[in-house]
Structures are given as C-alpha cells and as structure tokens.
Amino acid sequence: MKAKDIVLKKSEKIEGVEVKGPWLDDAQSLEEVVSYYYRIGFQATHLGRAIEIWRKVEEKRERGEEIRVFLGYTSNIISSGLREIIAWLVKEKKVDVIVTTAGGVEEDFIKSLKPFILGDWEVDDAELRKKGVNRIGNIFVPNDRYIEFEKYMIPFFERVLKIEEKLSRPLTASEFIYEMGRYMDEKLGKEKEKSVIYWAYKNNIPIFCPAITDGSIGDMLYFFKEERRDSRLIIDIANDIVKLNNLAITAKETASIILGGSLPKHAIINANLFRGGTDYAIYISTAVPWDGSLSGAPPREGVSWGKIKAKADYVEVWGDATLIFPILVWMVMKARGQGYAQ
C-alpha cells in the first residue's frame, strides 16, 4: 500500500449532528449562545445534554407526572455563591430530597448570620491563621462567623434536647435540620430567605446529612456534651437511612442531580439501588475515575452496581460546578423556550 493511500485512507459515510458553534453576529443573547453547546463538542456537549435531561424531567413534572428529584452536593457548593441558586430551587420546589455534608448545613446557617468574603488562592495561609481567617479556596471565612454560630447553636441544642425528651426518642439528622429551619424562621431576619435550610423547612423538603457531626456542628456538639456530661442529646442516623431509601423505593421515577462526589453522591445513588436504579442522572464533577474513588466514578460505573438503570438518561459534565451549575439551572428554569440551535 502506498504512503498516500495510508494517509488519505477512504472513510465510510457517517451520520450525526454537525459540530458547529454560534456566529456571534447573529446571536442576540447568552441563551442563544448556550443553545449551541450541544453542538460545540467536548464538555460543552455534555452540558447541553445535562440541559436536555433536566428539561425533560421538569417538563414531565409540570405535566403532573411523578418524578422525585434528588439533589446532592458537598459543602464547598454552599461555601460558594451556588448556595443562593440551590435555595431558589428549594423555594420553588424544583427538588424533593437533598443530601449534603455537615458543611452544607452549617455554612448555610452561618451565611444567614454573616457573609463569607471573596479572597485569593495565593495567600500566606500561616498569616491567615494568625488573623483568625479560614480559607476555602479563594473564599475567606473569618472565625467570628463560627463564634456567632455557637451563640445560636448552644441554645438550639437545648431546644432539641427538650424536643427529644418530649418525644422520648432522639431526632434523626433530617429532623434535626428541619428544626434548624424552624429555629431560623423564629430567630433570624430577612437574610434567612436566601437559606436552603429555611426553604426546606417551609416546603417540608427533607435534608439528609449522614455525617452531621463532621464539621462545626460536631465541634459545637463536643463542647455542649463536654460541658453537660449528663446530657442525653443524641442524633439518630439509623432511621434516616430507612427514610431516604423509602423515598427512592416509593417513587414512580427518580432523577439524581449531583454536584461533586463524596457521601452525598453515594447516599443518593445507593438509595436508588433499592428501586433498581435512578431513571435520570446528572453528575457535575472534577473527580477522575482512574483512582477507583466513588467521587470519580462515572454514571456507567453506577449502572454496573444497579444504582443507575441500564436504560437511564444520564450524563457527566466534567468541570467546576460554580461555572456549570448557574448556566444549567438558568437554561432549564428560565430559558425553556430556547432549544438547541439548528
């Protein structure tokens, strides 16, 4: 075979969507630009698929079809400005079940007391420590936020203890968080209206946190129980797993939207295992699969476990959720009439 024949090998005809981006002279809005994402390629195509999947779920729900939407996210999502987007989704009842980590609970409460401050990645962390300033990436959290948080949490623990004594049983973590929402409603001002916990309480949307003690809430519980050695305050994790699994089992269809990895991701897809897998899945992650971690496991790996149905509609978008999620939510919830560019 000649070199030319090798290099210019004849190809078979293939059918498919033409790779094409927006011509900016013609685009009239950001929505029009994003409508091309599906055709751009690479992760833009995956984001386009995520928009398509969530729109399908939302349109079914609007027609009255039962699809229970599970939303999972790690604490850094609430550390960032995505907190307000998630709070809006909860306020508008666009999700039905939430799973997060301890930071995803406590930082939401803290932000209703005092804001986090935009900082920088390249700083002297030893100097920050001297100043009592904690760093989450390029977000600064002065320690006075946690001091203020303690002022609210210690009386809240006393309140929970009275509730548990009245019920003659411990509260589950989801009940504990529900009571936090009630407490916010009673004690805090207007800023609570940007809170996930507050709107979850108002709309009776459960927030599950299997690792509720793995953060500042755990620190406060330590201080509380050390100072009150006879305290019977307990948070029940066991009954929450029953409640979470049953929310999956009893759903006609489920959709799982997961930002990041870790515990929230597995808690949601494992609950869906009990019903034969979730029907729709959107992962947004920067984790890689080659280390075998759950955080990096792609949706198709979940299929092998029965946690995602073999015929499910799913996609993983690799990238920073702070870039991706605002576009995704806007295109699904606010720009519904903007379809794919032809």
Swiss-Prot record:
GO CC, sorted alphabetically, is: cytoplasm
Q: What GO molecular function annotation could you give as one example from this UniProt entry?
A: deoxyhypusine synthase activity
Q: Which InterPro entries is this protein grouped with?
A: Deoxyhypus_synthase_arc, Deoxyhypusine_synthase, Deoxyhypusine_synthase_sf, DHS-like_NAD/FAD-binding_dom
Which EC numbers characterise this protein's activity in its record?
2.5.1.46
In terms of superkingdom, the source organism counts as Archaea
Write down the required cofactor(s).
NAD(+)
Q: Disulfide bonds, which pairs?
A: none
State the family named in the UniProt similarity comment for this chain. Answer: Belongs to the deoxyhypusine synthase family.
Descriptive protein name: Probable deoxyhypusine synthase
What does the organism's lineage look like at the top?
Archaea, Methanobacteriati, Methanobacteriota, Thermococci, Thermococcales
